[in-house]
Amino acid sequence: MRQKLVIGNWKMHGSLAANAALLEGIKAGAAKATLAVCAPFPYLAQCQALLNGSQVAWGAQDVSAEARGAFTGEVSASMVGEFGCTYVLVGHSERRTYHGETDQTVAAKALRALEFGIVPVVCVGETLAQREAGETEAVVGRQLQAVLDALTVEQLSRVVLAYEPVWAIGTGKTATSEQAQAVHAFLRGQVAARDAGVAERMAILYGGSVKPDNAAELFSMTDIDGGLIGGASLKSADFLAIGNA
């Protein structure tokens, strides 16, 4: 039985004061799922200070594909690791769309995170046009395959996947539980072709307008192991409610 995992993605939101209130609220609650928050880089030290010793993990929203060097503005996995990060998001659709990240770049970032003991949360997903054209499996399959090709089975065993239909992020639209389950099952099957044991243990999260009122139905699906939560992760009550769905 896979333990549910709920990760909050704050995106480019937050302030020292607001974060403190949010994190204290999350810490004060309890959840059935494992909880984590992925904060902007400047707030990782604050997360470490406030969450260290708690049941809530923390992580970053991106990491460089490079280990070190003359890469102005980049943040390396070793730097992120110094702030106690458990997770790092790689390949979020907003990074792919706005920063031109390729499948190969995403795979390189996942590999770099693993080298420094950080769990990469590899995000895959299709646009509305791709879904309507019947290309969902081809698109997410290609995105996942780049990662499968770059990692050993042992490395793959330390990866979390997240399916985030681009058309359901921040739009208020949500994939039906059946639509989401179908893609999750497809992704697990693709991992199983590489290693069945890894596939059975791998957490595959759903991201796309998850809220307290739809989380339970989504999380009841066989291959949905939790959520990657955007807007609802900025309110402690909503985030905890999802963690208890």
From Swiss-Prot:
It catalyses: D-glyceraldehyde 3-phosphate = dihydroxyacetone phosphate. The keyword Isomerase applies. PROSITE patterns: TIM_1, TIM_2. The active site is at 92 (electrophile), 164 (proton acceptor). Transmembrane segments: none annotated. The keyword Iron-sulfur does not apply. Pathway: Carbohydrate biosynthesis; gluconeogenesis; Carbohydrate degradation; glycolysis; D-glyceraldehyde 3-phosphate from glycerone phosphate: step 1/1. CDD domains: TIM. Keywords: Cytoplasm, Gluconeogenesis, Glycolysis, Isomerase. Belongs to the triosephosphate isomerase family. Involved in the gluconeogenesis. Catalyzes stereospecifically the conversion of dihydroxyacetone phosphate (DHAP) to D-glyceraldehyde-3-phosphate (G3P). GO terms for molecular function: triose-phosphate isomerase activity. Homodimer. Its EC number is 5.3.1.1. This is Triosephosphate isomerase. Substrate binds at residues 9-11, 170, 209, 230-231. It is found in: Cytoplasm. One of its GO terms (biological process) is glyceraldehyde-3-phosphate biosynthetic process.
